[in-house]
């Protein structure tokens, strides 16, 4: 059994080492891209904003796949976005997604990076159905890293997908149900990286693919995640959270060495308001001891 590397060693390790501990399936749900545009003194409307944000997203995708992710699920449109009344937003979002996911430039980009890409929509849309069809390429192979863009228009839609699959296909196991919905076997997601408030709902998570999900929330808006930050997440995921033991005989006594931490421990999830936004309270106890 290999010794656990230090964080410093992991941050500088070759990609081949990192890929050995990365989960097969991950969900990435960013947010705050309009907030990031405001911080960059840019209008969060129009093509300039869409292209600017899109380039940052692509850097994140390259980061995740280069570190060993095999199936990356990316919620692009969610129910609250279809309910917005922001001028010049709702009427353009489908065109933005179609362009961002399946333009000719993007098809060439995927081929250059050897990615397979799918677009899932919970309801029929001519714009996105056409984009999904364009993503089906003759060179596609199940062994390629796969990007799954998905759109959820109504909070009931994920359930309807399961019910409809059950009506069309006879399945008796979860694995069979997954294959009926997605067209292939996919390992359950073990890593969820999101933004803002630490909350999860079924709109963000692909149906039937929630495994032992380890969750992380960045507070930097937009598609802003550096390689160092993602490696910190993977280090915590792969090493620090692996605390379960078959025999817990001596485990409980180890808590005595950290009595003040357990007796004065913080509540994760408490926050404060920064103008109209939520931001987490500090949870560091070491400075108080």
From Swiss-Prot:
Top-level taxon of origin: Bacteria
Molecular-function GO terms, alphabetical: hydrolase activity; transferase activity, transferring alkyl or aryl (other than methyl) groups
Keyword Hydrolase: yes
EC number(s) from the headed UniProt entry: 3.1.7.12
Keyword terms of this UniProt record: Hydrolase
Catalytic activities: (+)-kolavenyl diphosphate + H2O = (+)-kolavelool + diphosphate
Record's function text: Involved in the biosynthesis of (+)-O-methylkolavelool. Catalyzes the biosynthesis of (+)-kolavelool from (+)-kolavenyl diphosphate via the release of the diphosphate moiety through the nucleophilic addition of a water molecule.
Membership in a protein family: Belongs to the diterpene synthase family.
Name of the protein described by the UniProt record: (+)-kolavelool synthase
Native species: Herpetosiphon aurantiacus (strain ATCC 23779 / DSM 785 / 114-95)
